[in-house]
A protein has these predicted regions:
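Feature captures the catalytic cores and cofactor-binding loops of soluble hydro-lyases/lyases
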Residues: 209, 213-249, 344-475
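Residue "hotspots" at secondary-structure boundaries inside conserved domains
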Residues: 325-328, 367
C-alpha cells in the first residue's frame, strides 16, 4: 500500500501549472522549428518566428507564454493500492487548491479567467477555480497526473458530431476545420475522440491532446492500425488545406493529429475534434509516495535560435495623430508598427458599452473612441518592474456582434485582435472605411514588451476585462482587413491551398 501525502499532491499541481505557464513542451517547440524552416509563406513564417521567440522569452523570464492562462483540465489516474494520508479533501478539492496557489503565485501570477454562474452573472472566481478533473481508478500503487491549461480561443472551436456509421470521418474533418477560422491559433494539434457516447468522445479527444508530438516517427514507421492510418491521412490532408499559421495561409496548419477511440454502439459514430493552439501547455507526472513530483526544467539551449526581421517595407504609425484619411492607403497583408495610445476592450466591456449606448447614456467617463484604435485583450497582472503582464490578442470574431455599433456610434477607427472577422463585419469595416489589424496569438510576452505605459480608464470591476489605455512603441501588427474590405484570412488560405495543390502535382509528375 502506497501512502500519498495530500500536501505532495497539491504542491505538485501548483508546480506543474506554474511550469506549463512559461515552458512549452519541447516536442512541440521542435515541431514548430521544423514548420518554421519548411514554411514558404513569409507572413506565416514571421508568425511562427514570433511564437518561437516569445516561447524562449517566457522560458527565460518565467512569465506566461499567453495571456490566456487557460482553464485547468486534469486527468488523475489513481492506483487501487494507493492510500491518502488525509481524507478531508476530495481529489477535486486538492486539484483546486493547487490551482488556486499556482494562479495566485506572487512571483508569476496567472490570469484568472473562470467565471461562475455562466448562464447568469458570469462573475470571475478570482483564482481560476474550479478546475475540470477526470478521475480514473486503475491497477497499481501510484498516482498518474496529466494536466493542461487550455485557452478559450482553441477550446471554443471544439466540434462534435454524431455521424452515421457509414460516414467518412476524414470528410467531416476536412469540411469542418476551415469553418473553425483561425481563432484556435494554428499551427497546433488536433485531438480527435471516436466512439463510446458523445461525452466519452469529448473526453477522449481532450486526453489525446496530452500525448507527445510523434507524427514524424509514425510517418517513418508506417501505420499499423486503423487509427494510425487515419492520423496520417488527416495530417496530410489538413495541411493541404493551406490554412497556415494564424490562418494567414501556409504549409503547416497542424504539427500532429492525435486520435483516441473506443468501441461504440452499432448505430452510432460519435466524433469530437478539439484543437490545441500554438500555446500548447501540458505536463505528465507520477507520485509514488516519496514526495512531490520532481519536475525538471528544460535547458534553454534546447530552444531554436530564431530571429525575426521586419524588413524594409514596414509602415510606422503614430496612433496619437492618425486620421481616417491615413488608413485608406493601408493594404491587407502589410506589416505596421504602432506607437502611441490605444484603448483595450473585450467581451464584457463591449457588452457594457452596448447597454450604455442603448440606454442613451453615452460612453463611460474617460473613454473617447473617436479616431482611436481598440485592442481586444485581457492582460496578465504585472509583476516587479513590468508595465503590464503578457498581453496578447484575444479572438476578434467574438466582438463581431458589436462592431457595427462601435464603428457607427463611437467613431472608432480601427481594431486589433487575432483571427478572422465574419463577412458582415468585413462589410461594416469597408462601409465605415475602418481597418482591422492582427497581432500574433501565442506571442503575449513578446507583445507586452512593446507596451510602455498602462492604466485602467473604465470598468475596473471587470478585472482583466476592464478598459485600459496602453501606450505602445513599435507594436507589430498585420493589416488583416483594410478599408476596402480586402481580407488576408480569405486570401491567404485560398492562395496557399492552390499553391500546395500545384506543388503536389509537380511532385507526382516527377
Amino acid at each position: 500500500m502506497t501512502v500519498i501525502r495530500q500536501q505532495d499532491f497539491i504542491e505538485s499541481i501548483e508546480d506543474a501549472l506554474q511550469y506549463i505557464s512559461y515552458y512549452h513542451p519541447l516536442d512541440f517547440i521542435q515541431a514548430l522549428e521544423q514548420a518554421y524552416h519548411k514554411e514558404q509563406n513569409q507572413a506565416a513564417k514571421d508568425a511562427i518566428a514570433q511564437i518561437l521567440i516569445n516561447s524562449r522569452m517566457s522560458a527565460e523570464g518565467h512569465r506566461p507564454i499567453c495571456q490566456d492562462t487557460g482553464i485547468v483540465t486534469c486527468f488523475v489516474k489513481i492506483g487501487m493500492d494507493v492510500k491518502w494520508d488525509k481524507t478531508d479533501l476530495t481529489v477535486q478539492q486538492m486539484v483546486d487548491e493547487g490551482t488556486r496557489r499556482a494562479y495566485l503565485n506572487p512571483d508569476n501570477p496567472l490570469r484568472a479567467s473562470i467565471v461562475a454562474d455562466p448562464a447568469g452573472a458570469r462573475k470571475n472566481t478570482k483564482d481560476n477555480t474550479p478546475s475540470v478533473v477526470h478521475i480514473d481508478l486503475v491497477a497499481g500503487h501510484h498516482v498518474e497526473v496529466m494536466i493542461a491549461a487550455k485557452g478559450g480561443g482553441s477550446e471554443n472551436k471544439t466540434k462534435m458530431a454524431m455521424l452515421n456509421p457509414s460516414d467518412s470521418i476524414v470528410d467531416w474533418v476536412l469540411e469542418t476545420l476551415p469553418k473553425m477560422g483561425a481563432g484556435w491559433c494554428p499551427p497546433g494539434m488536433l485531438g480527435i475522440g471516436i466512439g463510446g457516447t458523445a461525452e466519452k468522445a469529448a473526453v477522449l479527444a481532450k486526453e489525446a491532446l496530452m500525448e507527445p508530438v510523434d507524427i514524424q516517427e509514425l510517418i517513418a514507421k508506417g501505420a499499423e492500425t486503423a487509427d494510425e492510418k487515419l492520423r496520417l491521412e488527416l495530417y496530410e490532408k489538413v495541411n493541404k488545406l493551406g490554412i497556415g499559421a494564424q490562418g494567414l495561409g501556409g504549409l503547416t496548419t497542424v504539427v500532429d493529429v492525435k486520435i483516441n477511440s473506443v468501441p461504440t454502439h452499432a448505430a452510432s459514430l460519435p466524433v469530437v475534434m478539439i484543437p490545441n493552439c500554438a500555446a500548447t501547455r501540458h505536463l505528465h507526472f507520477h507520485l509514488d509516495g516519496s514526495g512531490p513530483a520532481d519536475i525538471k526544467p528544460p535547458k534553454l539551449e534546447d530552444w531554436p535560435q530564431v530571429t525575426w526581421e521586419l524588413g524594409s517595407k514596414v509602415r510606422r504609425v503614430n496612433l496619437d495623430t492618425i486620421t481616417p484619411a491615413d488608413v485608406q492607403s493601408w493594404q491587407a497583408g502589410e506589416t505596421v508598427l504602432l506607437s502611441g495610445k490605444m484603448l483595450t476592450g473585450r467581451d464584457a466591456a463591449h457588452k457594457r458599452i452596448a447597454d450604455m449606448l442603448n440606454k442613451g447614456e453615452g460612453l463611460p467617463e474617460g473613454v473617447d473612441l473617436k479616431n482611436r484604435f481598440i485592442y481586444y485583450v485581457g492582460p496578465v497582472d504585472a509583476v516587479r518592474d513590468e508595465v503590464v503582464g503578457p498581453a496578447g490578442p484575444t479572438t476578434a470574431t467574438r466582438m463581431d456582434k458589436f462592431t457595427e455599433m462601435m464603428l457607427s456610434q463611437t467613431g472608432l477607427l480601427g481594431m486589433i485582435g487575432k483571427s478572422e472577422r465574419g463577412d458582415l463585419t468585413v462589410e461594416s469595416i469597408k462601409k465605415h472605411k475602418a481597418v482591422y489589424l492582427m497581432a500574433v496569438g501565442g506571442a503575449a510576452y513578446l507583445v507586452s514588451k512593446a507596451i510602455k505605459k498602462s492604466r485602467v480608464v473604465a470598468f475596473a470591476d471587470l478585472g482583466m476585462e476592464a478598459i485600459y489605455e496602453f501606450e505602445v512603441e513599435d507594436m507589430p501588427v498585420t493589416v488583416a482587413v483594410d478599408s476596402n474590405g480586402n481580407n488576408v484570412h480569405k486570401q491567404g488560405p485560398a492562395i496557399w491551398k492552390a499553391n500546395i495543390a500545384e506543388l503536389d502535382a509537380k511532385l507526382k509528375a516527377k
